[in-house]
Amino acid sequence: MKYLKRTVLFLPLFFLLLNKASAQRKLDYTKLVDPFIGTGGHGHTYPGAAMPFGMVQLSPDTRLEGWDGCSGYYATDSLVYGFSHTHLSGTGIADYCDVLFMPTTGKPQLNQNDYRSHFQKKNEAASPGYYSTLLDKYQITAELTATLRVGMHRYSFPKTSEANIIIDLQHRDPVLDSWVEVVNDREIRGFRRSSSWAKDQSVYFYAKFSKAFKTYSLASDNQIKDGEKKLQGKNIKMFVQFDNPGEVIAKVGISSVSAEGALKNLDAEVPDFDFKKVMKQAKDTWQKELSKIQVEGGAPVLPPLPQQNNMGYGFGGNRPQPRTKTVDYAHIKQTIFYTALYHCMLAPNIYNDVDGQYRGLDQQVHKAEGFNYYTVFSLWDTYRAEHPLLLLIDKKRTLDFIKSFMAMNEQGGLLPIWPLASNETYCMTGNHSIPVIVDAYAKGLRGFDAEKAFKMMKDAVNRNQFGLDSYRKNGLVLAEDEKESVSKTLEYAYDDWCIAQMAKILKKDQDYAEYIQRAQNWKNVYNNQTGFVQTRTNGGWLSSFKPSDVDDNFTEGNAWQFSFSVPQDVNGLIKIMGGKENLENKLDALFSASSAMTGKSLPDITGTIGQYVHGNEPSHHITYLYNFTDDPYKTQYYLSMIMNTLYKATPDGLAGNEDCGQMSAWYVMNALGFYNISPGQNNFQIGIPIFDKATINLENGKKFVVASSGNATNSYYLQGMQLNGKPYDKLFLSYENITDGGYWDVFIGKLPNKLYMADLEKPVAAITDYPIVVNPYLVSPSKTFTKPITIAAASAQDSVKLYYTLDGSTPNLQSKLYSNPITISNTTTIKIIAAKNSMTSKVVSGTFSKIKEDVKAGVAVQTGQHNPSKKIQYK
């Protein structure tokens, strides 16, 4: 009887918990996505309809030019030119916006300034796979949805005998060639070949309309050509006109291969004109993808505050106004999170047709056998977080990415750097398809030819372009040989480290030895006299150094950000800096320095905290370097600051360019509480999870659950951790910790728990095999002189000997031993090496030229006196 009573008592609680769990499973994550986030500021995203990783991005075009018009849309614009079928998400260079459709009424206009329309933000709506707006000029409601390869328009016209759809093939990018053809009174097809960032991009399209058009006209150079069914040229437009149609649906398939391919895509993916069905399919697909990570909670709901006396606020005062509405910060956080996850899935983009055909980097048609071929890889950005995230939740697609890389290599002769459509743009530095491949292989992904991929990686870094020849010869890229020399040295060293990891797995000992040594070349641009990476030229350091200078020796940044770009050898960086305390002090200085940049002005440098630049990717790992110091709580402090201040649920809610998923992937990973600072190695650094609970639904059927207590009090300092019910005492998680499934419980408090943090095992990112001898450097007041000058030599490395020549010959261990500064009176080339334990550095060379008295002296190599005992102090 007692047992029965207990059962009855617990039944309501059981059903309550069951209903709560069921509700969580049924939660519509698409409602937590706001596609307008990132369309303002410098986010450069678009709000239109797209499928996850789809070929079509059907979105409104409101801006024709300018840096903040890269995606074709900007949040504050009030004019719309139409709806085109391809868009880039968050890039810093404009392209795409192909095949524009624009519904109008009245006499058809072909000039874009005549057919454009005002629209109002209050009439816009967007959700994953859907967009709508009202065109004020025509009172037409335009709705958009999409499948992978088809864009679907639904236009609701007012009553009119002149309901038009303009098709503009000249829109946006310079056109190399185009044509359009009327197939019948319900179908048209066409082609557009354009040149912009992608120098030679082809888009074919095939469009079908739900109703027959009563008439049409084709135009070349804005001149109507009566009676023509097909026109070809560089400025081709047309319109179709309906008589009081009410609603017209246009479905448009696209292809890089042919109009026939576009038709195949269209018929396969959208066989009818059921707009609602396609919209639901898009929503369901997005729901499935977004459900791969389920988050709950995150912050308390703050109730309204009582009305306060307004005294003291004044006009334009900066005091906060009384809160009159309930603020659900958890919902805001979840909106930021799921919009970020959504952005992570807008690129890369599938590029093959339904039959597998695609246009390759050689501009020839190929067929993807057994995989889908993708394009739009912003690899300098996305190797850092986007690809590690997708490797966790989408291994199948990651395998397709790698097979796409290898196909690109076969067709274009190089692993991709920044591939766009059927073009390699060669944008940015390094070759960061390499870490994507290596990270996947190191974490167990198979299904591709690893030996062939390894050869491709070696070929990519042994070319005689992009400064790689200078890098191999000198152990660094010299400024006189290549722009962005410091950044390229650091990027190449990291890529070499990745190749070394692959060689180690494949048991290629000779390759491992070579590339693990090359991975240490970052040391050759680190100046121990200043504590920063610096430009090397003519045997020494470039003079007039300012760490805040943005110049041509760095890629979209300066020495502050790039001095920490050694994720493969953080422990080596600590050693060369003189210890953990110096690293911590340097990090403190980074975050507390003035945010003012000197030198060039670059729009990419945004979202600053001191000289930390979250709006650009080289800074994205820096906060985690505190984990290697004695005060890892500072990682948690700055992560919380970044997530709470540089990500917002507003159009300007991104700190910089979205960069095809990287800016958002950083948030997703860090919101979960971990981040891989060096893809290619197995561990994720521990940060601070921001949700009460986050469940990663893995492809192997397992779940990794992150449970965080303390978020309800807006705290962000680690107090304790458990993994699968047992105390966890490391500042990192292994990949297997996550993919094997389990529970990671994190306890958070308001104050740093330094005693607890001191007991945690610190991460290691160190290169210990095959240490190199660091290049020495020359110190001279100038590289030209009129009277005898004295040139000193030095090394940042302890216990080395320097050997040099003055006759142009290559120095060796039998050359003259350097002991005192060298005085020269004639034009001389000094070549010098450092030696330690029978190993030598690369040869460092500097030429110093004697000139006549009346010739102005050249730029100095380095001014001032070398002080080998100088201690760097960071404040």
Model-identified regions with their sequence ranges:
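Bacterial Sec-dependent N-terminal signal peptides
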Residues: M1-R25
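Short, compositionally stereotyped local motifs that mark structural "simplifiers"
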Residues: K20, A765-Q873
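Accessory carbohydrate-recognition regions in carbohydrate-active enzymes
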Residues: Q24-H387, L391-P435, Y441-L490, C498-N524, ...
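Short proline/glycine-enriched turn/loop motifs at strand-loop junctions of beta-rich domains
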Residues: K159-S161, Y716, S795-V800
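ATP-dependent phospho-/nucleotidyl transfer catalytic cores
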Residues: D495
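Short strand-turn-strand beta-turns centered on an Asx-Gly dipeptide
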Residues: E699, L723-K726, D807-G808
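Beta-strand-rich recognition domains
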Residues: V705-G710
